[in-house]
A protein has these predicted regions:
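Beta-propeller blade termini
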Residues: 1, 17, 39-50, 92-93, ...
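Hydrophobic beta-strand segments that make up the repeating blades of beta-propeller
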Residues: 2-7, 56-60, 117-121, 165
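Blade-edge motifs of beta-propeller repeat domains
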Residues: 3, 17-38, 77-99, 137-160
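Flexible loop residues that form catalytic
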Residues: 8, 48, 61-62, 109, ...
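Hydrophobic beta-strand positions in blades of beta-propellers and related beta-sheet-rich domains
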Residues: 13-15, 56, 74-76, 134-136
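A generic tandem-repeat structural signature
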Residues: 25, 29-81, 85-87
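Surface loops at the rim/top face of extracytoplasmic beta-rich domains
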Residues: 97, 111, 120-135
Length: 174
């Protein structure tokens, strides 16, 4: 069993690998050192590249960034299967601007065999308290994502401040 700790702004994230004896050891991750200026708000593990191991999606946010700030970009780190993570060159679509993300969840929402992403905006930069939006990013099967929110769930526009999300079949309809 292993675990991830996201870093605050100017503090690097950390991964701890567990041993069979139940101890945890810090795994040095150079790309986390490079990205310590980001503020990690949430994180999730999912198999982004379909190779059977868990990759890492880190949600970036904060209220002191400007709307076009690069530090509002969510990041994907690819696991090489040995617990070593490297920043992916894969770019996620800007949903319409850089956002202060609060959460991300993963599910095959279009039932095509790959994972898609829901991204929830925590707050409007320089406009705290205004309604924020949710976004459905659909995977084309090759790791390229497109914003399909208007097609799949337009009511996610300015729904409110989104702090958490989870996919589940609540009504048992598949």
């Amino acid at each position: 069993l292993d675990f991830f700790l996201g870093g605050a702004k100017y503090q690097r994230s950390r991964i701890y690998l567990g041993s069979k004896a139940g101890e945890f050891f810090l795994k040095q991750t150079p790309d986390f050192d490079k990205d310590k200026d980001f503020e990690d708000v949430d994180a999730a593990l999912f198999d982004f590249d379909g190779d059977g191991d868990k990759d890492l999606y880190i949600v970036s946010g904060g209220s002191d960034n400007m709307e076009l700030d690069k530090y509002l970009t969510d990041r994907i780190y690819i696991n090489n299967g040995k617990g070593e993570f490297n920043l992916s060159g894969q770019k996620l679509p800007d949903v319409d601007h850089k956002i202060s993300t609060g959460t991300a969840s993963f599910e095959d929402i279009d039932k095509d065999g790959d994972l898609d992403i829901f991204v929830g905006e925590r707050l409007k930069i320089n406009n705290y308290g205004l309604p924020s939006s949710g976004f459905m990013l659909v995977n084309d099967g090759k790791g390229n994502f497109s914003n399909q929110t208007q097609k799949l769930s337009p009511e996610l526009n300015e729904i409110g401040m989104i702090t958490d999300s989870e996919f589940s079949d609540i009504d048992n309809d598949g």
